[in-house]
């Protein structure tokens, strides 16, 4: 069997920054460091940080007063920020700057009283944080996931409307939903370029090319990773068998029936270390050649908070 590697794949700038924030906070301040929600959606990464002293919680009520807490890359609502401030928690914010950009769009709509429509997945922490930027009772923010949801929106054609999207959605599904929104609400405003981030876009485009050459596409990523799930879905829609896996232990013998070429990619929160461990396992199943596709070079970089750039000196 032959292995073909997608490019780009794996960590994006926002994930790199978020992990660095937790690592630096542990190095500078020592354990325990509390993290609200999984800092990124990858089991391997989270377990590694937990082993080093990070404590992952879902609510700030689980964090002692005055402790250090890190907000995950997915962002938090204004209510969570206020709660942290009221309880005198020391906060390091690992929210991806591209998520923060969407937060600013929602906050702007809230200040103006413009009704907002967010395209995203209900229950995802990024969506909860983004929805939580809207506080104007004279307007409102409404969540839709697909074209069919548009019919139940309560707004009128002449309402002042704007839309924004979760950053990790399917490019194809989102384009279809935006087109349907504009058809129903011709005057609706939105971002000049959709809010789906560069890493999601690049990895989906890379999988399109990978799937054309593969009998099976393996996506390295955790089940709760939105962008990883979209990669597996995209390959399946192209008629190619696909599997989402956390690590080599997930690999099953029957995946390789009639498979001559295996394509491998990784979600934006999956480290290259996992990709290489899966390649090693595939060699045991008979994979004997590896090819890496050419792809877009990514050079995006996001700084960590200033307080974490220089070690404290006693």
Swiss-Prot record:
EC number: 1.17.7.4
Active site: 126
Cofactor binding annotation: Binds 1 [4Fe-4S] cluster per subunit.
Residues engaged in binding [4Fe-4S] cluster: 12, 96, 197
Recorded GO MF terms: 4 iron, 4 sulfur cluster binding; 4-hydroxy-3-methylbut-2-enyl diphosphate reductase activity; metal ion binding
InterPro entries listed in its UniProt record: LytB/IspH
Presence of keyword Oxidoreductase: yes
Cofactor requirements of the protein: [4Fe-4S] cluster
Biological or metabolic pathway of the protein: Isoprenoid biosynthesis; dimethylallyl diphosphate biosynthesis; dimethylallyl diphosphate from (2E)-4-hydroxy-3-methylbutenyl diphosphate: step 1/1; Isoprenoid biosynthesis; isopentenyl diphosphate biosynthesis via DXP pathway; isopentenyl diphosphate from 1-deoxy-D-xylulose 5-phosphate: step 6/6
Binding site for dimethylallyl diphosphate: 41, 74, 124, 225-227, 269
CDD domains in UniProt: lytB_ispH (cd13944)
Keywords annotated in UniProt: 4Fe-4S, Iron, Iron-sulfur, Isoprene biosynthesis, Metal-binding, Oxidoreductase
Enzyme class per UniProt: oxidoreductase
Reaction(s) the record says it catalyses: isopentenyl diphosphate + 2 oxidized [2Fe-2S]-[ferredoxin] + H2O = (2E)-4-hydroxy-3-methylbut-2-enyl diphosphate + 2 reduced [2Fe-2S]-[ferredoxin] + 2 H(+); dimethylallyl diphosphate + 2 oxidized [2Fe-2S]-[ferredoxin] + H2O = (2E)-4-hydroxy-3-methylbut-2-enyl diphosphate + 2 reduced [2Fe-2S]-[ferredoxin] + 2 H(+)
Binding locations of (2E)-4-hydroxy-3-methylbut-2-enyl diphosphate: 41, 74, 124, 167, 225-227, 269
Binding positions for isopentenyl diphosphate per the UniProt entry: 41, 74, 124, 225-227, 269
GO biological process: dimethylallyl diphosphate biosynthetic process; isopentenyl diphosphate biosynthetic process, methylerythritol 4-phosphate pathway; terpenoid biosynthetic process
Entry-linked HAMAP family: IspH
Family recorded in the similarity comment: Belongs to the IspH family.
Stated role: Catalyzes the conversion of 1-hydroxy-2-methyl-2-(E)-butenyl 4-diphosphate (HMBPP) into a mixture of isopentenyl diphosphate (IPP) and dimethylallyl diphosphate (DMAPP). Acts in the terminal step of the DOXP/MEP pathway for isoprenoid precursor biosynthesis.
Protein name per UniProt: 4-hydroxy-3-methylbut-2-enyl diphosphate reductase
């Amino acid at each position: 069997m032959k292995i073909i590697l997608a490019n780009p794949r794996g960590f994006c700038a926002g994930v790199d920054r978020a992990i660095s924030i937790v690592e630096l906070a542990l190095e500078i301040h020592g354990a325990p460091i509390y993290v609200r929600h999984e800092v990124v959606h990858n089991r391997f990464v989270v377990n590694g940080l937990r082993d080093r002293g990070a404590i992952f919680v879902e609510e700030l009520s689980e964090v002692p007063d005055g402790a250090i807490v890190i907000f995950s890359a997915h962002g938090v609502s204004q209510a969570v920020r206020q709660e942290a401030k009221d309880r005198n928690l020391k906060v390091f914010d690992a929210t991806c700057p591209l998520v923060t950009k969407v937060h600013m769009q929602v906050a702007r709509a809230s200040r103006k009283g413009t009704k907002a429509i967010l395209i995203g997945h209900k229950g995802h922490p990024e969506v909860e944080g983004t929805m939580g930027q809207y506080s104007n009772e004279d307007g409102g923010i409404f969540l839709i996931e697909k074209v069919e949801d548009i019919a139940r929106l309560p707004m009128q054609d002449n309402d002042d409307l704007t839309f924004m999207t979760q950053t990790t959605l399917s490019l194809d599904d989102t384009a279809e939903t935006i087109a349907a929104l504009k058809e129903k609400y011709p005057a609706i405003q939105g971002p000049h370029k959709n809010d789906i981030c560069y890493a999601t876009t690049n990895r989906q485009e890379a999988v399109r090319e990978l799937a054309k050459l593969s009998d099976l596409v393996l996506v390295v990523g955790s089940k709760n990773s939105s962008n990883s799930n979209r990669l597996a879905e995209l390959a399946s829609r192209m008629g190619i068998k696909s599997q989402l896996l956390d690590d080599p232990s997930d690999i099953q013998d029957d995946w390789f029936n009639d498979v001559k070429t295996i394509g491998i990619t990784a979600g934006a929160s999956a480290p290259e270390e996992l990709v290489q461990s899966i390649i090693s396992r595939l060699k045991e199943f008979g994979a004997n050649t590896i090819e890496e596709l050419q792809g877009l070079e990514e050079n995006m970089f996001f700084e960590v908070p200033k307080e974490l750039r220089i070690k404290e000196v006693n």
